[in-house]
């Protein structure tokens, strides 16, 4: 097994995220399938990569301008998706998370968490190498090697030497993430996916200890 990484591991979107390990609760009302899958992945990561996960838990809070009756619908949807969702007293929520909005009138505790994307990625890479895989960083896939409609391998640019190299394999997997549509196009396959920019505000310290969402 050979993994080609365009630059350093976690150099792209992998290392530029909020580090939130979703419980799936935020999707429960509108997309039960995604919520269930999210929760299953959450529990799996806690099991196989506990050293990369911080079990902070999360709060979905209701503010005075919100409809408190929605809380019951939210909890019901979470339960249907297999997600733990416990209604707690606002006073308890303030004790658990002192930084929460003090005007809250309702709170639901869910198994959200925090994940270290750098440590998790490198742990995956190390485990793969231990099991015989090879990892080449600074190797950008520039083309696919195709004969008679069959993908036989890839061409990759070594960003350090500027040399174009060819790698052949019985199976070639497109693991380019959000940029996967660019690789797919080289095989004449259209993937309806594109990256969307977002903004994150980064502090030099932690403001709150639990994940806080508005219910």
Give the residues covered by each predicted segment.
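Flavin (FAD/FMN) cofactor-binding and adjacent substrate-gating region
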Residues: 61-131, 136-137, 143-150, 155
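Glycine-rich FAD pyrophosphate-binding loop
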Residues: 1-17
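Dinucleotide-binding Rossmann-like beta1-alpha1 core, especially the glycine-rich loop
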Residues: 19-92, 96
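Central beta-strand plus flanking loop segment that forms part of the substrate or channel wall
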Residues: 21-23, 188-211
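Flavin (primarily FAD) binding-site architecture
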Residues: 174-189
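Core beta-strand elements of the Rossmann-like FAD/NAD(P) dinucleotide-binding domain
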Residues: 160-171, 175
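Residue-level detector of anion-binding/catalytic polar loops
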Residues: 1-2, 51, 84, 134
